[in-house]
A protein has these predicted regions:
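Conserved Helicase C-terminal RecA-like lobe
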Residues: 1-148, 213-220
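SF2 helicase motor core recognition
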Residues: 95-100, 121-125, 134-183, 202
């Protein structure tokens, strides 16, 4: 069956918009002082994705939560329209837990991330494939990017993009593989030009290098 990739535009909440503009302003100042190193660029890219998800990590790994209500609302709308099972990918532990708390109010949901032991993961995967519940898996894509067959799902939603191409491409293959009987859909949620450019580069298997600099120069 065919696999379709869909882009879904969402808005930033006022709190996210404020954080995004502040970071963009800081980027411009930083770029004016001298070159942005590769390590700095990776950290800044991660910070942008945290703003998009609504969970910003501080210097000591403390988490500052900001509202991402429009993104969560869009996810719920997608889930209401989906008849088969669904996988939601989010790259940060705090966001995975937040989504689990929100979605379990209305759906049977399991979490897969680095905190879940291998035996428990396998039990979740077996139930997902063979039983009515869980209907939803919320996962860190890095923990589900290789070897699994999860064709009980027909839809994957990226709550925000990963910046790792191999992880993205392999995670999408969990539902688009032999044994799948439904048309499959990959939905990319994005609120900023940076997110859209990350998705474009993921699909094209291009490097993320220079992304932050392009933002600092006003090209994104």
């Amino acid at each position: 069956p065919p696999c379709t990739v869909q882009s879904r535009d969402v808005e930033l909440s006022p709190e996210q918009n404020k954080a995004y503009k502040e970071m963009k302003r800081d980027l411009v100042l930083q770029a004016a002082k001298g070159p942005i190193t590769a390590a700095n660029e990776a950290a800044l890219r991660l910070k942008l994705l945290q703003i998009s998800c609504g969970a910003i990590y501080g210097a000591n790994r403390e988490i500052h939560h900001v509202s991402a209500a429009p993104r969560l609302r869009a996810l719920r709308e997608i889930m209401e329209q989906c008849r088969e099972k669904i996988i939601v990918f989010a790259g940060f532990t705090s966001v995975v837990h937040m989504l689990h708390r929100e979605l379990k109010k209305d759906y049977s949901v399991e979490v897969i991330n680095g905190e879940v032991p291998a035996k428990a993961r396998n039990e979740v995967f077996a139930a997902f494939m063979a039983a009515e519940h869980p209907r939803v898996i919320v996962a860190d894509p890095g923990t589900m990017s290789h070897g699994l067959t999860l064709t009980a799902a027909s839809t994957i939603v990226w709550y925000a993009p990963t910046d790792r191409t191999e992880t993205y491409l392999q995670a999408n293959k969990r539902i688009d593989r032999p044994g799948q009987v439904h048309a499959t859909t990959i939905v990319q949620l994005a609120a900023t030009p940076v997110e859209r450019e990350i998705y474009r580069r993921l699909e094209a298997n291009e490097t993320m290098q220079g992304l932050v600099l392009a933002m600092a120069k006003g090209k994104l």
